[in-house]
Every structure is written in structure tokens, then in C-alpha cells.
Amino acid sequence: GAKTFNLSLSNANGAAFMPNRSTATVTINDDETVEFGSGSFKFAKSTYAVAETGGDAYVTVQRTGSTANPASVSYSTATINAQGGTDFTHVSGTLSFAANESAKLIAIPILKDNIADTGESFSVDLTNPSSGWTLLSPYSTTVTID
């Protein structure tokens, strides 16, 4: 809302005050607009675990700060010791958040093979947030296939 304060003039050297003119009320109108930005992206958790039964692993990206405007962030998977194309399908893209949207899921296909995998991992990384937006930790998360 609008902010007001009183301004008083006193001790004028070499000048005179007009009667009833030495005090004024100043009003600052709240007319600011929200900039495109002013928030951050991060993963909800730094690690996720998924069974090697096929299907998808889901990781959650959260948007913090102002959600009044649309914003976007890019993502991609990277191999740690799980093999892309054998254990999981590499994915990349851009998540587009609508106004007032604070979370989105990334689905990563997990591939079932004939080898019993235990503890194989890959990462999902966030990059390139919209102008004015930042990345918060964790901006990289590890998915472990058990």
C-alpha cells in the first residue's frame, strides 16, 4: 500500500517560514510492478531413488520467490555410472512455469535390462533460468537406480 510520512522544516537560517507551511505530509504511492524475475529454481530433493522395473523416475523442480509472472528453466540428464540408453533414457528440455505455478515434474524413463543393477546413478541438472531468475542448491540432483 501507499506509505506516508511528515516532513517538517525548522531552523531556517536567513529565511522565513510561511504560516502553516512548515509541515507537509508526503505520500509515496505503491505503483511498482513486479519485474520478470525475482525468484529461484531448485530441485525439491538432492537425491532420488527408483526401482529398475521400467517406468519413469520423477524429480520435482520448485520455483521460489515471486510466482506472479511466467518463467522457465532448462534441464538435462548426465551419466554418473548408470548408462544412458541402457539404464535410463537421457532427457533434456525446458520447463515453462505459468503465473502462480510453483512446481513441475521431470519424467525420466528408466529402462529395464537383464542385468541386476544396484546403485547405478545419473544426475539431472538445471541451467539457463529466465532472465532475472537464479538457481538455488540443489540445482543438480542424483537419481539412483536400485
How does the language model describe each region?
Residues 1-146:
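Short boundary segments that mark the start of a structured unit
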